[in-house]
């Protein structure tokens, strides 16, 4: 194998680099097309050099001040290119937005919009139908489809006449309410809620719930026009009696026993002739005598409790059975 000269190595590496450059030049980097168009447009606007065919930027005031007649030299092809570049930069429906970098940039620039802004922008975007075809249009559609935030109302500072009362009076008023009324009052306002908490902690006497009222509430749901005690519109109080629990069904009568006691005695007498029908140990007296710990005391000692020495003396004399 022959040795390779360093010149050949340099030539090979240069050829590889050229190939890589040529292959990489086939595809534009993200945002490169935008930079090219922007540089062309800025060069067309800022170029005032003589001897070059450019589209001039007309300024009527400066022309009138100088009093000179300027005849622009138009290059049709160059003017077309510049016009297209400017339109692509200014219009939101340009194909430049197909670059993923620009889509990300535009999507990050989209701010959270209010409901009024959404209405205005939806009207504007409806006029420009091609906007919906671009990625920017997709981002705008996503923002338009979001549910707008509910406008938060400012906290009401004004208080009613009941809430303006001192806290001790509010607590006394709350103490006269029933348990089922406290559930609704607790959510009226923050001040009444504090009064309810104080009433529960310190001043509530736990006389509620009224049992009769609770039973009546179970039976009848009051109409909003009704007040306690439940009255009709004509003013006649009608106390609704709670329904009685239905009686439980009676059991069916027991069938008569098939064996009779007289027949059982005759059978046992024949079977157990040598033995008594029931042994003495099985006989249980009809009336059991309750054992008495103490003998009946004389009427002069009506006491039930005794001292320790008295009990010891009674045990020594065998007075306890």
From Swiss-Prot:
PROSITE patterns: FBOX. InterPro entries: F-box_dom, FBS1-like. Residues 159-207 form the F-box domain. It comes from the Eukaryota. GO terms for cellular component: cytoplasm; nucleus. Residues 1-13 have a biased composition (Basic and acidic residues). Residues 1-23, 228-258 are annotated as: Disordered. This is F-box protein At4g35930. It comes from Arabidopsis thaliana.
């Amino acid at each position: 194998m022959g040795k390779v000269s360093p010149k050949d190595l340099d030539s090979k590496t240069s050829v590889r680099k050229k190939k890589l450059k040529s292959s990489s030049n086939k595809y534009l980097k993200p945002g490169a097309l935008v930079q090219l168009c922007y540089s062309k447009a800025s060069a067309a606007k800022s170029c005032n050099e003589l001897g070059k065919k450019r589209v001039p930027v007309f300024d009527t005031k400066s022309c009138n001040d100088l009093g000179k007649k300027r005849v622009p030299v138009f290059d049709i092809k160059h003017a077309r290119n510049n016009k297209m570049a400017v339109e692509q930069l200014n219009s939101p429906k340009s194909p430049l937005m197909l670059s993923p970098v620009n889509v990300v940039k535009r999507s990050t620039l989209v701010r959270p919009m209010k409901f009024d802004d959404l209405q205005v922008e939806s009207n504007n975007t409806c006029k420009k139908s091609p906007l919906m075809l671009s990625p920017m249009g997709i981002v705008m559609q996503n923002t338009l489809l979001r549910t707008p935030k509910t406008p938060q109302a400012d906290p009401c500072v004004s208080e009613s006449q009941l809430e303006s009362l001192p806290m001790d009076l509010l607590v006394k008023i709350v103490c006269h309410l029933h348990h089922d009324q406290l559930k609704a009052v607790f959510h009226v306002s923050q001040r009444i809620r504090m009064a309810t908490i104080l009433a529960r902690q310190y001043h509530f006497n736990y006389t509620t719930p009224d049992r009769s009222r609770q039973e009546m509430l179970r039976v009848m749901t009051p109409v909003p026009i009704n007040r306690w005690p439940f009255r009709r519109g004509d003013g006649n109080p009608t106390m609704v009696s709670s329904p009685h629990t239905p009686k439980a069904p009676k059991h069916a009568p027991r069938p008569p026993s098939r064996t009779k006691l007289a027949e059982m005695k005759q059978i046992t007498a024949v079977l157990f002739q040598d033995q008594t029908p029931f042994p003495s140990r099985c006989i249980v007296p009809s009336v059991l005598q309750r054992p008495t710990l103490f003998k009946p005391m004389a009427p002069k000692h009506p006491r039930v409790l005794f001292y320790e020495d008295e009990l010891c003396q009674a045990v020594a004399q065998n007075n306890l059975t």
